[in-house]
Regions:
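NAD(P)H-binding glycine-rich loop region in Rossmannoid oxidoreductase-like domains
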Residues: 41, 52-93
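Active-site helix of classical SDR
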Residues: 148
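NAD(P)-dependent short-chain dehydrogenase/reductase
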Residues: 154-206, 211-213, 249
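Conserved Rossmann-fold NAD(P)-dependent oxidoreductase catalytic core, especially the SDR/UDP-sugar
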Residues: 99-144
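Substrate-binding strand-loop-helix patch
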Residues: 176-180, 203-215, 231-249, 268-270, ...
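Amphipathic terminal alpha-helices
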Residues: 288-305
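N-terminal Rossmann NAD(P)H-binding glycine-rich loop of SDR-like oxidoreductase domains
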Residues: 8-27
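Mid/C-terminal beta-alpha module of Rossmann-like enzyme folds, strongest
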Residues: 192, 217-220, 224-265, 273-274, ...
């Protein structure tokens, strides 16, 4: 889908997903503004070189004095994760901060609020639909994460109606690609001989989504924004286990994964039904093995055997 000539705000442009998305939208001849704290000056330089206008803002304080109000679209990928279990701080930055941002950008044609499949109640190896039960999925790994994301979704749903702002909430599963992701961290663990801890309800299955497919799906998702807010799973066509992708990463690099099963910490499987997503975006095309190989080639080409 052609998507150019728009004024777009991207939050979290220094993050794994936002870094790729902001640059891709700028390359498509859009006026892209990136909002973050920009603690890494090198990433800021790369973004600016790609044509992204980088500005600092504080979502917790609601200080958007550096940001105009006339954006056509907002792609809200930014997330704040407090250390430990500070729910109050996470709520202020994520839930309240998102509501304040939506108020500031209420004139937009579409607002994409990136959530997570971590909002679902763990359901073993069942496919999770947008209507599936919600729960505290990620507590064993990130204490505040799931509840904070659920709270943020509630604020987003309210703000979409209050400001008549067409909105889509995308529940992202496992993003990966040339800029890294969870499989890349597993590869680093393998290279260092560190065990990969997995839940005993094996295999540990997830809906991988390559960064190319994330970028390709954004225009259609923004067009699908509605009032009340639309909600859609954001995962790839292939459901892959950590066991399989770590084994394949091992084949590519000559490294053997060490798998350790324990119920004290690791997440359970999260597999999502993508029927609704594909009705909006059409099929997403990246084969997971090709995506993994390209990830290694981009990060450490010398590791490929």
């Amino acid at each position: 889908m052609a998507f150019s000539g728009h004024k777009i705000l991207v939050t979290g442009p220094t993050g794994q997903v936002g870094f790729v998305v902001a640059q891709a939208l700028a390359r498509q001849d859009n006026e892209v503004w990136g909002v973050a704290r920009f603690s890494d000056p090198e990433k800021k330089k790369v973004l600016e070189a790609a044509g992204v206008k980088c500005v600092s803002a504080d979502l917790e304080k609601g200080d958007f004095s550096s940001i105009p109000k006339d954006f056509d679209y907002v792609v809200h990928l930014g997330v704040f994760r407090a250390a430990g279990d500070d729910f109050d701080l996470d709520f202020r930055n994520n839930a309240e901060g998102t509501g304040l941002l939506m108020s500031h950008c209420r004139a937009a044609k579409g607002f994409l609020a990136c959530s997570t499949t971590g909002v679902y109640q763990a359901a073993g190896h069942s496919l999770l639909k947008e209507t599936s039960e919600l729960g505290d999925n990620h507590r064993s790994m990130m204490t505040t994460y799931s509840i904070t994301k659920i709270a943020t979704e509630a604020v987003v749903r309210y703000a979409a109606r209050e400001f008549n702002l067409p909105t889509i909430i995308t529940r992202l599963c496992v993003p990966y690609g040339n800029n890294g992701g969870w499989p890349y961290y597993h590869l680093l663990m393998m290279k260092h001989g560190t065990p990969i801890q997995l839940h005993p309800d094996k295999p540990s299955m997830y809906s991988l989504l390559h960064e190319d497919d994330i970028v390709a799906s954004i225009p259609a998702l923004l067009q699908a924004a509605t009032v009340p807010a639309n909600i859609v799973n954001w995962g790839g066509a292939e459901t892959v286990s950590i066991e399989d992708w770590s084994a394949y990463l091992g084949e590519l690099t000559g490294t053997k994964p060490i798998l350790e099963y324990t119920d004290k910490g690791p997440l359970e499987s999260v597999m999502v039904d993508t029927t609704k997503l594909f009705s909006i975006t059409g099929p997403l095309k990246t084969n997971w093995k090709d995506g993994m190989r390209r990830m290694i080639a981009a990060k450490h080409p010398d590791w490929l055997v």
